[in-house]
């Protein structure tokens, strides 16, 4: 058995088209929903804890549907449009396929791990007491559990109050828009010293959008700042991991070309990242001095 492919033949078409990654993606998608709705760990709390005493916002600045559009649909459409414009026809289908595969893996894997972690941590949201509606007359500075003191009839909303760390909006926005940032850097050759600065600024826009989405969760009192920071870090790391699984580093001589791309596509004009030879930097030799 081959150590690389785990099959009897050393090479197969599935390696180039990353069929095993497609299978992993399907598993992540199927597991996401049940993982999120698992029973979270219910931590004890004080009814006079000011950090969980904020009002419950009935209207969110970025709800779940908007999050999916901003962090997954928009990056997907951007990749399809820009990729169709810039990519050479010899590898157009492959570059679009692998680019979208990497984005999907980054987004759904981040969502899976975020939901799994937040259910195990069970930290309370900033608006938890408004969700709980505790009975009146309870003593201060005393630990309580939700089942003992909460009077709300909305059990699903109450359980969601235990899912704050890390922030899913933050992790998923940085997973999708962070991946788009890396992808734009590679496709626009932003790390080449010959390219204008505006390319880097355009590539940076998705990160700005992700940051605004993440910060909106503190404005809605859905998350603490540490939840947003941890979620953003998780999403960014996952975006980088899955981007590098598909593409070379953004400072590679051919950063736009997928790693498994066997086409002969190269840059029309050579863009090198090599150091200038010392003799060009110091043309005067010892003999001429």
UniProtKB/Swiss-Prot annotation:
EC number per UniProt: 3.6.1.75, 3.1.3.106, 3.1.3.4
Pfam families referenced in this protein's UniProt entry, alphabetically: PAP2
Cytoplasmic side stretches: 43-65, 114-172, 215-222
Region of interest (Phosphatase sequence motif III), residue spans: 216-227
Residue ranges, annotated region (Phosphatase sequence motif II): 166-169
Catalytic activity: a 1,2-diacyl-sn-glycerol 3-diphosphate + H2O = a 1,2-diacyl-sn-glycero-3-phosphate + phosphate + H(+); a 1,2-diacyl-sn-glycero-3-phosphate + H2O = a 1,2-diacyl-sn-glycerol + phosphate; a 1-acyl-sn-glycero-3-phosphate + H2O = a 1-acyl-sn-glycerol + phosphate
Location relative to the cell: Vacuole membrane
Outcome of swapping residue 125 to A: Complete loss of DGPP phosphatase activity
Transmembrane segment boundaries: 22-42, 66-86, 93-113, 173-193, 194-214, 223-243
Induction field: Induced by the transcription factor ZAP1 during zinc depletion and negatively regulated by the transcription factor GIS1 predominantly during nutrient limitation. Induced by inositol supplementation.
Description of how activity is regulated: Inhibited by sodium fluoride (NaF) and pyrophosphate. Strongly inhibited by manganese ion and, to a lower extent, by magnesium and calcium ions. Also inhibited by Cu(2+) ion. In an indirect manner, it is also inhibited by the zinc ion which is able to form a complex with DGPP and prevent the enzyme from removing the phosphate from the substrate. Not inhibited by N-ethylmaleimide.
Superkingdom of origin organism: Eukaryota
Protein's membrane topology: Multi-pass membrane protein
Alphabetically ordered keywords of this record: Hydrolase, Membrane, Phosphoprotein, Transmembrane, Transmembrane helix, Vacuole
Residues found modified as Phosphoserine: 285
Phenotype when changing residue 169 to A: 91% decrease of DGPP phosphatase activity
Gene3D superfamilies linked to this entry: Phosphatidic acid phosphatase type 2/haloperoxidase
CDD domains linked: PAP2_containing_1_like (cd03390)
pH-activity note: Optimum pH is 6.0-8.5. Optimum pH for geranylgeranyl-P-P phosphatase reaction is 5.0-5.5.
Any further remark recorded for this protein: Present with 3038 molecules/cell in log phase SD medium.
PANTHER family hit by this protein: LIPID PHOSPHATE PHOSPHATASE (PTHR10165), RE23632P (PTHR10165:SF35)
Domain notes: The phosphatase sequence motif I (including Arg-125) and II (including His-169) are part of the cytoplasmic loop 2 and phosphatase sequence motif III (including His-223) is part of the cytoplasmic loop 3.
Family: Belongs to the PA-phosphatase related phosphoesterase family.
Protein name: Diacylglycerol pyrophosphate phosphatase 1
Upper lineage: Eukaryota, Fungi, Dikarya, Ascomycota, Saccharomycotina
């Amino acid at each position: 058995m081959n150590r690389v492919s785990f099959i009897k033949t050393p090479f197969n078409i599935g390696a180039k088209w990353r069929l095993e990654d497609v299978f992993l993606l399907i598993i992540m998608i199927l597991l996401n929903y049940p993982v999120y709705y698992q029973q979270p760990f219910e931590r004890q709390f004080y009814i006079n804890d000011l950090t969980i005493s904020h009002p419950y916002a009935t209207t969110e600045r970025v709800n779940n549907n908007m999050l999916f559009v901003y962090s997954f649909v928009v990056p997907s459409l951007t990749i399809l449009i820009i990729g169709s414009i810039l990519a050479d026809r010899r590898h157009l289908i492959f570059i679009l396929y692998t680019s979208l595969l990497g984005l999907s893996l980054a987004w759904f894997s981040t969502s899976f791990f975020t939901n799994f972690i937040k259910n195990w941590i069970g930290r309370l949201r900033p608006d938890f007491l408004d969700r709980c509606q505790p009975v009146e007359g309870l003593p201060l500075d005393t630990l309580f559990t939700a089942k003992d003191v909460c009077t709300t009839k909305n059990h699903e909303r109450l359980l969601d109050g235990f899912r704050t760390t890390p922030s899913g909006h933050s992790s998923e926005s940085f997973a999708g828009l962070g991946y788009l940032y890396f992808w734009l850097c590679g496709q626009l050759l932003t790390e080449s010293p010959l390219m204008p600065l505006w390319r880097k600024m355009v590539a940076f826009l998705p990160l700005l959008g992700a940051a605004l989405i993440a910060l909106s969760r503190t404005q809605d009192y859905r998350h603490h700042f540490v939840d947003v920071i941890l979620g953003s870090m998780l999403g960014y790391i996952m975006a980088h991991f899955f981007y590098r699984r598909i593409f070379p580093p953004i400072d590679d001589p051919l950063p736009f070309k997928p790693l498994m791309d066997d086409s002969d596509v190269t840059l029309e004009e050579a863009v090198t990242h090599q150091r200038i030879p010392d003799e060009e930097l110091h043309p005067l030799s010892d003999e001429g001095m």
